[in-house]
């Protein structure tokens, strides 16, 4: 339908909706059920259980194991034997492993989907006459969208009202140009690129405001099949997953070579070829950590959910890895370091006696109320904190907001922009017109040629300008945020509502000073940062004196630090900025464009940088930073789309908590990797050493596969949810350290060798002291039990680099549960006779269990001693 060629009235009639009230909730729900959710379907969609299950077998080692089981059946059948039990057990374990793989994959996917839903875009619509914020997926045809600067446009629509609306449609056109919109009727044959009375899904609002009737949603939009912000699917591997995948493949090759050597040695020692082949294949399957990337995904997803409960939504998995190595946090001041609850504490104007001049005070407050975007909802004033504070001050000063807005409605505006640092509105005024401009004093004063002095207008000469600047400086020095207001009277309605037309030859009226006190928790968070080797930096559009005063109160600014302003940045080369950034903790009067330079200056020093932002123009800085942090409450959808993480409470302390969690998650992944690799090396060592010395095979193929099943998944995942060490924020950032740094490789090798030696010792004791001559069943049973149980016990060693006596044994209930289930399963296959027969083991007596228990517990004291030596070495 050619919506662009219809009048707004015709569009509303066709859509069966009302401009002032929108759809009712019931009607919107009906349309949602009929038309479906507002999203573009993308990719293959969710895999079925069958596809997921079959995908688990798409692995060379698993296929080799199945082939070995089939060969076992064929050989048994060829030899006229009826014993297919080994093959059946191997296949059963393979199938059980596949089910566990599907379960892990499903859990990770559900967790990631839940997190995507939390960070999905929102839309402001009229429903039943009330403005509501709803998930963008719930927008339907006929909804009335209310657009403002920074909003993500989630549906195609026809513009009904337009107030300086400009959009960026690069997601559709490929060109990042600002497109000025209009509301007039266009010809039917107007090209898509010229339909300026339409907005398109996948674009966003650069400036201005608008009211739009939704004409198409989901697959019916122009963007159609193109992947836009709303349906963003990020399935790329994270750097850590890639690294682990490569590590796994390397270890896999090593395991295959060792298993090949074991097979060859077995043949040289005249061992039966087929049992040796089965042992080698089973060992390879058990020893290769093919589940590492999947376990890491689960650990990351669980960590992300935990962070979501603490008001941090992670949008991209790599952000979790990067968080732990953050060295600089560049934070906005307002709302992040402060309470975002401004209160006007002082008014100033040219001349004296403002405190006694009630009429002039009321006039200044009236101007601030006219040039203001706040709204009243019941008894509450809703809006941006600065504007809300001005409106509240006006009400307290006797100005009726409702009466003023009805008497002097807004007929035009030039919206605020970070570049101009000004906002202007136009109103009728007693048969004439008045334009009101408010904004940064240093910018606004330059636009003024006259001023109010006493009860009259006067020339804004050098003396009066100096007086205004002095009063501005005094308020700023007292950490007040200062906003100035000016006006211009018009005999006729202005022809053009542009900054060039309206923001000149103004009459300076006065200034308001307001305070946004620091958040109580921000000071403690700054202190934690500094202990953790993280440098907090304040970035603000406020006056330098205001910023410095707040930063000093928070502990960000210290004696010897410097403060840089946007004006100084403009005059600096990139090299000079890099040098200046070394001592700078406060950047004041900066624009969003400056933020990118600040980020790059720190990055050139080799620092990992986190940056906060909330506006449309903050998006480049958020993308440039190693970790982009968007604001959840006051952030635009564009900023959220560019960010790696979203702070749902806009709080600096939440960033610090996220860094703590990020460090904990990274350490937990290290723990899981350490545990898996040391356990797998233990399994290889058990068989390899036995072959080297010409001993009988300590473990049978099905026993190796069972150990792999019991010890690999549950304990590793349980380690992934371990609470972070209490001193995690007292350590310096990782700064690109390898996953295997701090001697981890040697510890893995030594601990793996220890586990292997314990299993061999159990095999030797069982065979020599408890087996009948020529039998190995007790020795194998004891080796089987020790190998499995010692790995489960060893998981506790992974919990901390500190002594286990320093942490709570009940601190990780999931690990206790994994240990209980693993021990129960292991003891069950030995002590339950039918299972013992299947696994070719025998029930153990009390003495044998005591020996098994003593050997299985050995990793605890040995690793405690290793940790003690390591701590002493580090101190030296």
What annotation goes with each model-predicted range?
Residues 1-732, 737-740, 753, 768, ...:
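Conserved cytosolic headpiece of P-type ATPases
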Residues 85, 775-782:
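Membrane-interface starts of transmembrane alpha-helices
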Residues 747-762:
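Alpha-helical transmembrane segments of multi-pass integral membrane proteins
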Residues 763-770, 775:
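Long hydrophobic segments that form regular secondary structure
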Residues 711, 755-756, 780-795:
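Generic alpha-helical transmembrane segments
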């Amino acid at each position: 339908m050619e919506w662009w060629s219809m009048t707004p009235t015709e569009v509303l009639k066709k859509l069966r909706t009302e401009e002032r009230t929108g759809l009712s909730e019931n009607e919107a729900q009906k349309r949602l059920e009929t038309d479906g959710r507002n999203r573009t379907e993308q990719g293959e969609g969710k895999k079925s259980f069958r596809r997921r299950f079959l995908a688990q077998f798409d692995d060379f080692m698993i296929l080799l194991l199945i082939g070995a089981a089939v060969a076992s059946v064929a050989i048994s059948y060829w030899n006229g034997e009826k014993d297919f039990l080994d093959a059946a057990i191997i296949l059963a374990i393979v199938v059980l492993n596949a089910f566990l793989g599907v379960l892990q994959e499903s859990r990770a996917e559900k967790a990631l989907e839940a997190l995507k839903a939390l960070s999905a875009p929102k839309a402001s619509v009229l429903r039943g006459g009330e403005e509501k914020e709803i998930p963008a997926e719930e927008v339907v045809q006929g909804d009335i969208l209310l657009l403002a600067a920074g909003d993500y446009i989630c549906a195609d629509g026809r513009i009904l009202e337009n107030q300086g609306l400009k959009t960026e449609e690069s997601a559709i056109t490929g060109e990042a140009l600002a497109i000025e919109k209009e509301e007039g009727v266009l010809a039917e044959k107007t090209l898509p690129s010229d339909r300026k009375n339409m907005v398109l899904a996948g674009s966003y609002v650069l400036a201005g405001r608008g009211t739009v009737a939704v004409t198409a949603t989901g697959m019916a939009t122009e963007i159609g099949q193109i992947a836009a912000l709303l349906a963003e699917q990020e399935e790329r591997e994270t750097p850590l997953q890639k690294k682990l995948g490569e590590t796994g493949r390397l270890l896999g090759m090593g395991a295959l070579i060792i298993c090949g050597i074991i097979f060859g040695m077995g043949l040289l020692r005249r061992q039966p070829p087929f049992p040796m082949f089965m042992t080698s294949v089973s060992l390879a399957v058990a020893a290769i950590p093919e589940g590492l990337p999947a376990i890491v995904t689960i650990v990351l997803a669980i960590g992300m959910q935990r962070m979501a409960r603490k008001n941090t939504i992670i949008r991209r998995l790599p952000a979790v890895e990067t968080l732990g190595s953050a060295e600089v946090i560049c934070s906005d001041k307002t709302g992040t370091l402060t309470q975002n609850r401004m209160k006007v504490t002082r008014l100033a104007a040219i001349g004296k006696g403002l405190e006694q001049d009630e009429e002039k005070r009321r006039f200044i407050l009236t101007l601030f109320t006219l040039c203001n975007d706040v709204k009243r909802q019941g008894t509450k004033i809703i809006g941006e904190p600065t504007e809300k504070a001005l409106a509240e001050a006006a009400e307290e000063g006797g100005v009726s907001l409702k009466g003023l807005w009805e008497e002097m409605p807004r007929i035009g505006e030039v919206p605020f922009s970070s570049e101009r640092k000004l906002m202007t509105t136009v109103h009728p005024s007693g048969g004439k017109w008045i334009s009101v401009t408010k904004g940064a004093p240093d910018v606004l004063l330059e636009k003024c040629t006259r001023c109010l002095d006493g009860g009259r207008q006067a020339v804004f000469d050098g003396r009066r300008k100096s007086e205004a600047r002095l009063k501005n400086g005094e308020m700023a020095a007292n950490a007040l945020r200062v906003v100035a207001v000016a006006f211009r009277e018009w005999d006729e309605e202005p022809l053009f509502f542009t900054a060039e037309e309206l923001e000149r030859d103004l009459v300076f009226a006065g200034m308001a000073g307001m305070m946004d006190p620091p958040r109580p928790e921000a000071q403690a968070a700054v202190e934690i940062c500094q202990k953790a080797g993280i440098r907090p930096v304040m970035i603000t559009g406020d006056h330098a004196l205001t910023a410095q005063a707040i930063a000093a109160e928070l502990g960000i600014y210290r004696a010897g630090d410097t403060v840089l302003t946007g004006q100084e940045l403009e005059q600096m080369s990139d090299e000079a900025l890099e040098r200046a950034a070394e001592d700078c903790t406060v950047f004041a009067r900066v624009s969003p464009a400056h933020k990118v330079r600040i980020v790059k200056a720190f990055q050139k020093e080799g620092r990992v940088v986190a940056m906060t932002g909330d506006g449309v123009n903050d998006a480049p800085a958020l993308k440039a930073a190693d970790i982009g942090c968007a604001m959840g409450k006051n952030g635009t959808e564009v900023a959220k789309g560019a960010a790696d993480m979203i702070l749902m409470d806009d709080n600096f302390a939440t960033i610090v908590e996220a860094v703590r969690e990020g460090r904990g998650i990274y350490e937990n992944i290290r723990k899981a990797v350490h545990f898996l690799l040391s356990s797998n090396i233990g399994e290889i060592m058990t068989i390899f050493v036995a072959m080297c010395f010409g001993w009988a095979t300590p473990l049978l193929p099905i026993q190796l596969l069972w150990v792999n099943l019991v010890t690999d998944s549950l304990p590793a995942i349980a380690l992934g949810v371990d609470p972070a060490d209490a001193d995690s924020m007292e350590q310096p950032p990782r700064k690109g350290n390898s996953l295997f740094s701090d001697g981890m490789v040697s510890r893995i090798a030594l601990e793996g060798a220890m586990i292997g030696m314990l299993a061999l010792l159990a095999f030797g004791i069982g065979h020599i002291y408890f087996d009948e001559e020529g039998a190995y069943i007790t020795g194998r049973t004891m080796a089987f039990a020790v190998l499995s149980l010692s790995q489960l016990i060893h998981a506790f060693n992974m919990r901390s680099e500190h002594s286990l006596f320093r942490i709570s044994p009940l601190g990780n209930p999931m690990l206790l549960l994994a240990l209980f289930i693993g021990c129960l399963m292991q003891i069950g296959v030995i002590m339950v006779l039918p299972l013992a027969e299947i696994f070719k083991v025998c029930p153990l007596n009390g003495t044998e269990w005591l020996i098994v228990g003593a050997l299985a517990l050995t990793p605890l004291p040995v690793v405690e001693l290793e940790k003690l030596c390591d701590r002493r070495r580090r101190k030296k």
